[in-house]
Amino acid sequence: METPLKAPEGSLGSYNEPSSCTSEQDAAAQGLVSPGDEILYQLYQPLEACDNKCYCKKCCYHCQMCFLNKGLGIWYERKGRRRRTPKKTKAHSSSASDKSISTRTGNSQPEKKQKKTLETALETIGGPGR
């Protein structure tokens, strides 16, 4: 013979007690709503999105979700990634390729020619003063 399983004495309680998932209207209809039960009902309410955009003190403490989001600044929603700016058009890079190498690199060769001409000019003048 098998014995039926008994629930432990410290389990969820008797079946006569209203559960936390019953609605407030059901609890009010039963007449079992006390201030403590109402607070517990509000505490165990599921976190639902709140459409209120106000950040005043009253609205920050409106519900647990508002407190987390507005009061503490914790957002569990997925943030959208920023999109990268599109690369510049091909016309810009093609204009750089039209220029010669010396103009893109800062005219390094013409500077060398200028230095050589200055050196030759100084030699023809007569060198140092003495």
Swiss-Prot record:
PTM annotation: The phosphorylation by CDK9 does not seem to be important for transactivation function.
Location of region: Cysteine-rich: 50-66
Residues the record lists as Phosphothreonine modifications: T85, T89
Positions carrying Phosphoserine: S94
Gene Ontology molecular function: RNA binding; RNA-binding transcription regulator activity
Compositionally biased region (Polar residues): 13-25
Impact upon substituting T3A: No effect on P-TEFb binding and Tat phosphorylation
Low complexity: compositionally biased ranges: 92-105
Record's comment describing the protein's domains: The Arg-rich RNA-binding region binds the TAR RNA. This region also mediates the nuclear localization.
Role of this protein: Transcriptional activator that increases RNA Pol II processivity, thereby increasing the level of full-length viral transcripts. Recognizes a hairpin structure at the 5'-LTR of the nascent viral mRNAs referred to as the transactivation responsive RNA element (TAR) and recruits the cyclin T1-CDK9 complex (P-TEFb complex) that will in turn hyperphosphorylate the RNA polymerase II to allow efficient elongation. The CDK9 component of P-TEFb and other Tat-activated kinases hyperphosphorylate the C-terminus of RNA Pol II that becomes stabilized and much more processive. Extracellular circulating Tat can be endocytosed by surrounding uninfected cells via the binding to several surface receptors. Endosomal low pH allows Tat to cross the endosome membrane to enter the cytosol and eventually further translocate into the nucleus, thereby inducing severe cell dysfunctions ranging from cell activation to cell death. Through.
Quaternary organization: Interacts with host CCNT1. Associates with the P-TEFb complex composed at least of Tat, P-TEFb (CDK9 and CCNT1), TAR RNA, RNA Pol II. Interacts with CCNT2; the resulting complex is unable to bind to TAR RNA.
Family as reported in the entry's similarity comment: Belongs to the lentiviruses Tat family.
Name of the protein this chain belongs to: Protein Tat
